[in-house]
Swiss-Prot record:
GO biological process, one term: tRNA wobble position uridine thiolation
HAMAP family per UniProt: tRNA_thiouridyl_MnmA (MF_00144)
Purpose: Catalyzes the 2-thiolation of uridine at the wobble position (U34) of tRNA, leading to the formation of s(2)U34.
Reaction(s) this enzyme catalyzes, per UniProt: S-sulfanyl-L-cysteinyl-[protein] + uridine(34) in tRNA + AH2 + ATP = 2-thiouridine(34) in tRNA + L-cysteinyl-[protein] + A + AMP + diphosphate + H(+)
Species this protein is from: Desulfitobacterium hafniense (strain Y51)
Annotated residues for binding of ATP: G12, M13, S14, G15, G16, V17, D18, S19, L38, G129
Disulphide-bonded residues: C105-C204
Protein name: tRNA-specific 2-thiouridylase MnmA
Molecular function terms, GO-annotated: ATP binding; tRNA binding; tRNA-uridine 2-sulfurtransferase activity
GO CC term, one of those recorded: cytoplasm
List of catalytic residues: C105, C204
Length: 370
């Protein structure tokens, strides 16, 4: 890359090894790199609880930027994160859904407001340490989201709702690397502290993974006991609030039924948790809405794909069928598609994303509504 071709890129630096190496690799490739860390921890909450945006993480990101010789800034995104991610997360659980806050954060925060800030700074690209790959057709200009070399770390599921414009201004420097190689490369470059940091496993704003206590603290008046019922409406016992349960759950129900019972779903209006036996947890179909298409402009007729119903779920053969005049269906956000699986899937969970693949490419995805 010549100086006249030098591009400016903003790297979202979380203080972890992946984003640190994303910045390092881009600088080595000749980009003008600016490191930015988003401060998103809830206002009034503890600032240093070990999450990706804690004071410790910000200090780690600043230290890495200094070692790399790049500028580093911290942007206060607390309000936008609180209103668009934490409120969404809380309200979804209170509505009987099991949300995925990372997909909402990527849509609204990282590739929404953060990308706009990066562009306002004159950056050509936004880069992150995600394990994913962006490809572009040189003739049509269409961008594609593809699985990375390290398929175990594949994060394309979390990125299915990126638009064409967002993908055109996105770089994923780790696309062709294995995670263990990234750690080795970080150590070789003297980034010893971040090279040894463990992978984050929990939701970033709930480091102890106790989402029930988190929601209870924010909305105690909305969590009320109610009845466990079967599909016929027969009362089986009492539950301690809808947020304590998710589809497919068996343990922690707090009631003995004489046989294994599993959560099948919720009657939110009646504040009821619907239970059934294991075989009832499986289903061949789901409905999805709030759709985003990447590899194609849209779906006009049946389309055969592989589908993933949660982040670490295996890919499953399926057919997408668009439903006509579906915008008025309960829970619809725009058009709705029916997804028919070749084999039944366990615990299809409203609120989660379903993401569609063909080969290595992400076709698109949407939010499961039933």
């Amino acid at each position: 890359m010549t100086l006249t071709e030098k591009k400016k890129v903003v790297v979202g630096m979380s203080g972890g090894v992946d984003s640190s190496m994303a910045a390092a690799l881009l600088k080595e490739e000749g980009y003008e790199v600016i490191g930015i860390t988003l401060q998103t921890m809830p206002s009034g909450g503890p600032d240093d609880v070990g999450g990706c945006c804690s004071i410790t993480a910000i200090d780690d990101a600043r230290r890495v930027a200094h070692q790399l010789g790049i500028p580093h800034y911290v942007l206060n995104f607390r309000t936008i994160f609180d209103e668009n991610v934490i409120d969404y997360f809380t309200n979804a659980y209170l509505s009987g859904e099991t949300p995925n806050p990372c997909t909402m954060c990527n849509r609204v925060v990282r590739w929404g407001e953060f990308l706009r800030k990066a562009r306002a700074l004159g950056a050509d690209y936004l880069a992150t340490g995600h394990y994913a790959k962006v490809l572009q057709d040189p003739q049509s200009g269409r961008c594609f989201l593809s699985r990375p070399t390290d398929t175990w770390k594949d994060q394309t599921y979390m990125l299915y709702n990126l638009t064409q414009d967002q993908l055109k201004h996105t770089l994923f420097p780790l696309a062709d690397y294995k995670k263990e190689h990234i750690r080795e490369m970080a150590a070789e470059r003297g980034l010893l502290r971040v090279s040894r940091k463990p992978d984050s496993q929990e939701i970033c704003f709930i480091p102890d993974d106790d989402y029930v206590s988190f929601i209870r603290e924010r909305s105690p008046e909305k969590i009320k006991p109610g009845n466990f019922v079967d599909r016929q409406g027969n009362i089986l016992g009492r539950h301690q609030g809808l947020i304590n349960y998710t589809v497919g759950q068996r343990k922690g129900l707090g009631v003995t039924f004489g046989k294994p019972m599993f959560v099948l779903g919720f009657n939110v209006e009646g504040n009821e948790v619907i239970l059934g036996e294991d075989q009832e947890v499986y289903a061949h179909t789901l409905l999805a809405t709030d759709l985003n298409w990447i590899a194609i402009p849209g779906v006009e007729g049946p389309l055969t794909v592989q589908a993933k119903i949660r982040y670490k779920a295996p890919l499953a053969e399926a057919k997408i069928i668009p439903l006509k005049d579906s915008e008025t269906l309960p829970g619809a956000i725009g058009p709705v598609v029916r997804v028919e699986f070749t084999t039944p899937q366990r615990a299809i969970t409203p609120g989660q994303a379903v993401v569609f693949y063909q080969g290595e490419l992400v076709v698109g995805g949407g939010k499961i509504i039933t």
